[in-house]
Amino acid sequence: MCSNLMNLGQDIKTLEENGADMLHIDVMDAPFVPNLTFGPDFIKAMQAVTTMPVDVHLMVDDPELIMSKFPVRKGDIVSPHIEVKKDYRALAAKVHEAGGLFGLAVNPETDVEAIKEYLDVLDTVTLMLVHPGAAGA
């Protein structure tokens, strides 16, 4: 969201050559947050230029739909928001089956206790310090 998209392929290669071991991408769909960013095709394009795992932060109303349109690779992280209230066990199973890691993101105003019932399927948790959707926040 804060990078020059015209140079992103080269930037990814430069990061990889200099020791980066993971990339992060924010996927926003406009209904869940006030911005619209990258989608599944962009994730696939990133995956095509690197073997580094991609940390996909899904700030979307329908994480199942987005997840069905890009491959989760070994080491990739997929983190939808707890506020969407989906079947996170089924989503986690799909991600784990592909060799990826599953997480949940939590908005600042949401009680962190909301993720308690999913702790047994979580590999990571993202605690948002600002409401999602703000660039560089």
Predicted regions located by residue number:
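Conserved N-terminal beta1-alpha1 strand-loop-helix module at the mouth
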Residues: 1-77, 85-87, 93-102, 115-122
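Beta-hairpin (beta-strand-turn-beta-strand) motif
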Residues: 59-61, 83-85, 107-109, 130
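Short glycine-/acidic-enriched loop or helix-start segments at secondary-structure transitions
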Residues: 89-90, 136
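Histidine/lysine/aspartate-rich catalytic loop segments that bind and position anionic ligands
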Residues: 105-137
